Regions:
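Plant-biased recognition of short, low-complexity, intrinsically disordered N-terminal tails
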Residues: 1-6
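N-terminal interaction modules that seed assembly of large macromolecular complexes
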Residues: 7-72
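A generic structural micro-environment signature
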Residues: 24, 29-31, 62, 75-77, ...
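Long, charge-patterned amphipathic interaction tracts in eukaryotic proteins
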Residues: 47-122
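Glycine-rich, aromatic-bearing surface loops/beta-hairpins
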Residues: 113-166
């Protein structure tokens, strides 16, 4: 019982923080659509949303979300110690821990997720362009990778489900 409450609390926080940082479920679903439309004729937006919801319901995904967003928020407030403060605040390209954390999300649905993640990280469509816009004054060093990873994992899930139907 107590364990259930704790789990709900983590999911609530993860979803609340995504929203507060400017990311809606439909923004991530748009990325899934972008990744999958060429492989599934008649792909529906509601299927993309449903798969994002499934990914968001996983505890390991929620853990990655609250950890990454927490670090972004603290960096934005200048509350981390050096050298980590500067590394995260400036999104230093050699840091790489943001991507490692995102891999824990991509991993949930197997290896095809990595291809999707790499592709979307290069293209930066939709919400990813917004999250990478440094002129907003926001620190999204972790969040951009997390959002790309959720989209990649949801795409893998959708592809697996479609393969099972065929
Ligand atoms: Mg990053």
């Amino acid at each position: 019982m107590a364990e259930d409450k704790k789990i709900n609390h983590v999911e609530e926080k993860a979803r609340k923080w995504l929203k507060e940082r400017g990311v809606e479920v439909k923004d991530i679903a748009n990325l899934v659509y972008f990744l999958q439309e060429k492989y599934h004729k008649n792909l529906k937006m509601e299927d993309c949303i449903a798969n994002v919801e499934k990914v968001l319901s996983k505890r390991e995904v929620q853990n990655a979300i609250i950890t990454g967003i927490q670090l972004d928020i603290l960096a934005e407030k200048g509350m981390l110690e050096e050298p980590l403060q500067s590394i995260i605040a400036t999104d230093e390209s050699l840091y790489g821990v943001d991507e490692i954390l995102a891999f824990s999300i991509v991993n949930v649905y197997g290896s095809i997720g990595f291809t999707n993640y790499g592709y979307i990280d290069k293209q930066k469509p939709g919400i990813l362009a917004y999250l990478n816009d440094k002129s907003t004054g926001k620190c999204n060093t972790f969040l951009d990778d997390i959002v790309g990873a959720i989209a990649a994992a949801a795409s893998s899930r959708l592809a697996h489900a479609a393969a099972n139907v065929e």
